[in-house]
From Swiss-Prot:
UniProt key word Transmembrane: yes
This protein's GO CC annotations: plasma membrane
Organism per entry: Brucella suis biovar 1 (strain 1330)
Family, similarity comment: Belongs to the resistance-nodulation-cell division (RND) (TC 2.A.6) family.
Compartment list: Cell inner membrane
Positions of transmembrane segments: 10-30, 341-361, 366-386, 387-407, 444-464, 478-498, 537-557, 867-887, 892-912, 928-948, 971-991, 1002-1022
UniProt gene name: bepE
Region forming the signal peptide: none
Biological role: Involved in resistance to several unrelated toxic compounds, such as dyes, detergents and antibiotics.
Designated name of the protein: Efflux pump membrane transporter BepE
GO molecular function: efflux transmembrane transporter activity; xenobiotic transmembrane transporter activity
InterPro entries reported for this sequence: AcrB_DN_DC_subdom, Acrflvin-R, MdtF-like
Amino acid sequence: MNRFFVDRPVFAAVISIVLVLAGLICIRILPVAQYPELTPPQVVVSATYPGASAETVAQTVAAPLEQQINGVENMLYMQSSSLGSGTMQLTVTFALGTDPDQATINVNNRVQRATSSLPQEVQRLGVTVDKRFTTILGMVAMFATTDRYDRTYVGNYALLNVVDDLKRLPGVGDVQLLGNIDYSMRVWLRPDKLAQYNLTPSDVSAAIQEQNAQFAAGRFGDQPDPHAGPFTYTATTQGRLPDAAAFENIILRSSSQNAATLRLKDVARVELGTESYLVDSNLNGTPAVPIAIYLQPGANALNTMELIQNRMNELKASFPAGIDYAIPFDTTKFIKVSIEEVVHTFIEAIILVVLVVFIFLQNWRATLIPVIAVPISIIGTFAGMYVLGFSINLLTLFGLVLAIGIVVDDAIVVLENVERIMTTEKLSPRKAAIKAMGEVTGPVIAIVLVLCAVFIPVAFMGGLVGEMYKQFAVTIAISVTLSGLVALTLTPALCALILKPGHHEPILPFRIFNRAFERVTSGYTRGVRFFLKRATIGLIIFAGLLGSTYYLFERVPGSLLPDEDQGFLFGVAVLPPAASLERTTVVLDQVSENIRKNPAVDNVFAVSGFDLLSGGLKTSAGTMFIMLKDWKERTTPDADARNLPRTIMGMNAGIKDGMVLAFNPPPIMGLSTTGGFELYVQDRTGGGVESLTQATKLITEAAAKRPELQGVRTTFDPNVPQYDIQLDREKAKAMGVPINSVFTAMQATFGSLYVNDFTLYGRNYQVNLQSEAEFRRDPGDLKHVFVRADSGSMIPLDALVTVKRIVGPDQLERFNAFNAAKVTGNPAPGYTSGDAIKAMQEVAAQVLPQGYQIAWTGSAYQEVSTSGTGSQAMIFGLIMVFLILAAQYERWSLPLAVITAVPFAIFGALLATDLRGLTNDVYFQIGLVTLIGLAAKNAILIVEFAVLERESGKSAIEAAASAARLRFRPIVMTSLAFILGVVPLAVSTGAGSASRHSIGTGVIGGMLAATFIATFFIPMFYSLIARKPPKKHEDETADTPETPGGTGGGI
């Protein structure tokens, strides 16, 4: 085998060409995204109970649904939100990896069990079950450029002509028009006119149901008919009414005596309006309709957004004059720029690696070999990624950047050995290649096995962190495997073809470098011999290093992922409870105008009536999507998205009618609402709103005193002004008034009463009753609303009910079937999410009363549930390295000499991270896993050659010293190539730089320690372990000696 590929260079070349072709083909078809699917699947159950209070919705709608859904397969947690507008949304979150379609089916089956226990009105309107697409791709804004079209027309034009079209595009998961502005036939009742004609809202509702209905009229001449004619005719008749004019003419009462007819237009105003008037929105001050677009799981984000842009341009050609669109919110800009930055880093890494190799080899022919070999392994990796269903994302690209410095090792190990044999033994390139392969085949295979043993088992870890590990680790494992294949096939063939016998005197700069490196090598050798002779001192230093490593592990703060400048921010304006939508719109317009004055801001999309923090519709809150200018235009620290929130809140601090909050989005969109933490304070005692309020107040006030925390607040507000209406049921019964007629009249007057549907443009829309605005402004208007007693007399509502002003919540949330209050917050400057989580846990343990506890959600849930995962991955990697080496060496003790290199790498990584003020996040932990393999690789090169020297008859100390001196240059060369290949990650700027800094800093620090510190100690540990000569097997003969790794000196 040693000479097979040396003698067959075409065969070796064909293998590499196939790898490159497969990789190039797969690059074109692999999906591109910022991250793989890291957000847990969610299923949303929605229901509406028009006119009901938040408490009523929670008790009669949310609770029965939760009781049935609780415990559905693979469920992590569920959360419901019941609003004073009568809407309820229940979100069920499932474990990562759950099939969202199957989860939707399972939830829907549970919902069907609960349907019969829901209020009749809720059943009529229907309960919807949908899977939620958590990855928002962007937002399209449609607006009128003239006064000809109002927001209702623009929104419904978008619904009919844009939304459905975009939904059909490949890669689009869902398209939602925010604000629920579907057409609705609005019947605006005048209670004074109803009273004048002795009518009630129920009479109007019954008349509409009777006359706006679809009827089947049958067929003439249909079978069976023994005297059937030659034709069969279908009979048609007017069914649903087509427009507002037809609804106006609905007959409410008709008299045969005087031919008088009372029509709907006599007691109400009818118009084509919208289903809801709870939301208003504008783009940079211009009224606009927001259309949110969500990405389908596994789809190519960049291609999908390009399809959307192209399709919108095509649709624009048919827009009515005066209607236009913009795409102010586009998350793919960050994806595109951050991936471009990683690609630039990738190219810089290749250049630096080639430069290091050339400096050490000092021969352009020799340098050409790894230059050819490295791209083959990297490009071929894309084929492996495609087979495994991976995408081109930040994690896989990080893996490829680190892989550059790793895969070059195998080529250099072979090349350096061939050159050494050519120089010392004066052999031809072909013979040197054959002999070199006999010596390095074992180490190359061992390195590949060890690196794969580190990375592949990590891929089987579960959860969000496990998925991130898998993307990264498997990418490197594929590249390392292909690198080993190329090193054993193409590299020796290239050595035999490209290298030339005889070496000329190197040029002056190289001679200076060589002399300097020889002095370094001599100093290194003296240091190695010092520790070989004084092992006690070495062991004491090693023990101190272990203690320092433990201290740094405790000192470096933990977090899930670093905050990034993603090119946009979220803003929220919160007004006093019960503030009207008009007040909110005025404040939001003022805030938006202020924000647009900041030179770093590009667009502001403001949505009044939507509270991003609570996820519900509130007239007293508004949300802003703030798009920033390109990263190249924002080079100063104050223009960084991570620093802008403080600036934005400061410039709006003078607004007296509301509080303005701004925050950077979470690192992974869809995992949580904000970039901070989210939790729920659960009431497990059933104590009611007041008890929950007190418990929430205790925890927020205590959290405000902790230095690790800032901005801790609750979305739970129990002090929203309300009216409590009490019906005197005994009086109503005594007067012969049905109880249900009282509440139907109130709903149709002060709320919105859904009657039935009508058809327009091929779609079905709701018909809704509600009083004109002048009759529903305050409780005094109750005197204008009448109900009919059994005797036929008309009774005003104010004679049956009493009204009292109270305060209460307009939104009630439940978490895992318990009443709960949502609390959000952020780490204070200088602290991490891990610090904040720990502080909140301590606060909760100290102040929450018996029966109350906190439950994490979003990114905080993932961080808490994956705590310790990094340590598990590292320990698992160490165990696998040990077992692989034990199998290779056929000894349990010798692998310990290799394992001892790992603590040095961990120490260096932690020290570098601590000095730079970074955190122990997932990227850092991924880097640690990489360092285990790389540190072990360096140790393997020393131990392998020490084993060969030991078998040649040298003592353990001499074998260790000789191996250290012999392998120092290739170790330094490969390690420097790797380190310089990672430097662009650690010093990068722009989009996605925080994650690149996190992984680059730790890896560089670890490799520096593994290269320039651990190499002094590895020979010492080998000598301590190998002092006893290896035992000979009984069946070994003198003429067939075997190395521990088999033939050729393998490990």
